[in-house]
C-alpha cells in the first residue's frame, strides 16, 4: 500500500513525540469533533483556539457536510486507495530557532488514515482492494512533494505539498494540493507530531473534497 524512499542524510537532531501514534490520532479526531465545521471548499481560511494557541490554516479541520455529495439518490461512489508515496527522510525537517529537527512522522500512512475517514464521511465507499478490476472504481494515488516547517518567536509555520491522482475508465486527473498552518505561541517541540497530523489532515480534507466533486 505504501512506498517509502530512504536516503542518507546529514545527522540532525532527532525529534520524537511523547504521545503514541494512537494518542495523536485520538487527539486530532477529538479536536475535529470539537471544532466548528467549515466548508473545505471555502477560500476564506480557518481560525481556532487549539490547546490554548491561535491556529490559522487555509482549510478547516472539520468539514461541513456537503449535501450535494451526500445525495442518496446518486449511485454510491467507490474508490480504491492505491499508493501513497512518503516524503524523503531529508525533507522531514523542522527548523527550530537555528536547529534542524527530524520530524518522525510517516506522512503517507497518516494521510491514508485521515483520507479514508474523510471519504467515508462524505458517503464514499472505500474499498480495501480492486481485485475485480472494476473500471468504475476510482484509483487514488498521492505523492508528497515538499514539506517546510519553521519555529520562530511568533510560533510554528508549516507548509505541505502533494500531487493527487484520480483515475478510472472515465478520467485520469492530477491535482497539486497545497496546505499551510500557523500556530501562534507554539514553543513546545513535543507537540510537533500533533500539529503535523493536523497539517496532514488538512491535506486529506482538500483531497476528499476534490474526489467527492469528480
From Swiss-Prot:
Subcellular location: Cell outer membrane
Lipidation (S-diacylglycerol cysteine): 18
Record lipid sites (N-palmitoyl cysteine): 18
Segment forming the signal sequence: 1-17
Record keywords: Cell outer membrane, Lipoprotein, Membrane, Palmitate, Signal
Membrane topology: Lipid-anchor
One CC-aspect GO term: cell outer membrane
PROSITE patterns for the chain: PROKAR_LIPOPROTEIN
NCBIfam families to which the protein is assigned, alphabetical: outer_memb_MapA
Protein name, as recorded: Outer membrane lipoprotein MapA
Amino acid at each position: 500500500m505504501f512506498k517509502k524512499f530512504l536516503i542518507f542524510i546529514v545527522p540532525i537532531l532527532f525529534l520524537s513525540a511523547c504521545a503514541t501514534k494512537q494518542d495523536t490520532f485520538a487527539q486530532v479526531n477529538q479536536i475535529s469533533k470539537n471544532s466548528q465545521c467549515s466548508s473545505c471548499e471555502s477560500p476564506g481560511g480557518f481560525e481556532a483556539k487549539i490547546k490554548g494557541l491561535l491556529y490559522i490554516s487555509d482549510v478547516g479541520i472539520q468539514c461541513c457536510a456537503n449535501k450535494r455529495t451526500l445525495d442518496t439518490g446518486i449511485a454510491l461512489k467507490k474508490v480504491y486507495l492505491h499508493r501513497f508515496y512518503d516524503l524523503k527522510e531529508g525533507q522531514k525537517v523542522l527548523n527550530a530557532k537555528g536547529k534542524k529537527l527530524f520530524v518522525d512522522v510517516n506522512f503517507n500512512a497518516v494521510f491514508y488514515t485521515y483520507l479514508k475517514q474523510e471519504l467515508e464521511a462524505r458517503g464514499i465507499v472505500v474499498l480495501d482492494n480492486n481485485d475485480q478490476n472494476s473500471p468504475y472504481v476510482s484509483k487514488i494515488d498521492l505523492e508528497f512533494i515538499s514539506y517546510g516547517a519553521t519555529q520562530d518567536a511568533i510560533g510554528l509555520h508549516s507548509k505541505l505539498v502533494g500531487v493527487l491522482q484520480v483515475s478510472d475508465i472515465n478520467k485520469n486527473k492530477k491535482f497539486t494540493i497545497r496546505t499551510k498552518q500557523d500556530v501562534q505561541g507554539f514553543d513546545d517541540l513535543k507537540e510537533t507530531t500533533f500539529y503535523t497530523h493536523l497539517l496532514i489532515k488538512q491535506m486529506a480534507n482538500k483531497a476528499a473534497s476534490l474526489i467527492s466533486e469528480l
